[in-house]
Amino acid sequence: MADYKIHLLCEEEGIDVTFNCAEDTYILDAAEEEGIELPYSCRAGACSTCAGKVTEGTVDQADQSFLDDDQLLAGYVLTCIAYPSSDCTISTHVEQELY
């Protein structure tokens, strides 16, 4: 089973951290295990509270039901139901960008 390096960034929140995440672990769960506090609400991919934007790398978020095709193409991700499929960099706390 592969582990990937996840780099989270949010200048406003003072977040600039890298941690390992297994390919079968949700990014939000792995961040919490590292003591990183990220926003979340439903934990089911049905809202936008945990939204991030992938700026490098790829994720698998097939379980999400909230983001539309344009948002997915733009790189938005719901960290509560996203598995890493490569090393990636994600900007966090971007929910307001979706509206």
From Swiss-Prot:
Residues that span the membrane, as ranges: none
GO molecular function annotations of the record: 2 iron, 2 sulfur cluster binding; electron transfer activity; metal ion binding
InterPro entries, A to Z: 2Fe-2S_ferredoxin-like_sf (IPR036010), 2Fe-2S_ferredoxin-type (IPR001041), 2Fe2S_fd_BS (IPR006058), Beta-grasp_dom_sf (IPR012675), Fd_pln (IPR010241)
Location in or out of the cell: Plastid, Chloroplast
Presence of the UniProt keyword Endoplasmic reticulum in the record: no
Cystines in this chain: none
Amino-acid positions noted as binding [2Fe-2S] cluster in the UniProt annotation, renumbered to this chain: C42, C47, C50, C80
Any Pfam family: Fer2
Cofactor: [2Fe-2S] cluster
Any one GO cellular component localisation term in the record: chloroplast
Top-rank taxon: Eukaryota
Domain 2Fe-2S ferredoxin-type: 4-96
Subunit structure: Forms a complex with heterodimeric ferredoxin-thioredoxin reductase (FTR) and thioredoxin.
Function according to Swiss-Prot or TrEMBL: Ferredoxins are iron-sulfur proteins that transfer electrons in a wide variety of metabolic reactions.
Family to which the UniProt record says this protein belongs: Belongs to the 2Fe2S plant-type ferredoxin family.
Listed name of the protein: Ferredoxin
Species in which this protein is naturally found: Pyropia yezoensis
